[in-house]
């Protein structure tokens, strides 16, 4: 079940992100999150702002992700492409799991799609696993965005 994260989830969420960072490094993506992303303060802010969600099964958290409806400053400039639509959209960020739930990203997409019909998601050029999952779930590459800490490839949801 996907639900909003609450402050009591913080320790479990940070453990999930630690596992995800380790997995990313082991699978050829050591630079996207390094050793410290996402920082604790960002997670606290996401929880406070009701922008962080978790996947919970039988009382155990298995995944976390940020979902924000509204304009995302990182998507204002797109290179080598264009957006499919200028309609209001939701953005999926900071997807992480403990590796025990098959189809977690598909569940995220279904959950977010039910909230707003236009979605955007991005990932690092080295994150081949996430790129595969994004494309598998009906997104297409739309261009390249730049953020302060890295250069990301950017797909967006097909309409």
Where are these regions (language model features)?
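Conserved active-site alpha-helix within GNAT-family acetyltransferase domains
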Residues: 126-143
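A short beta-loop-alpha structural element at the N-terminal edge
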Residues: 1-15
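Conserved small/polar residues in nucleotide/adenosyl-binding loops
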Residues: 150-156
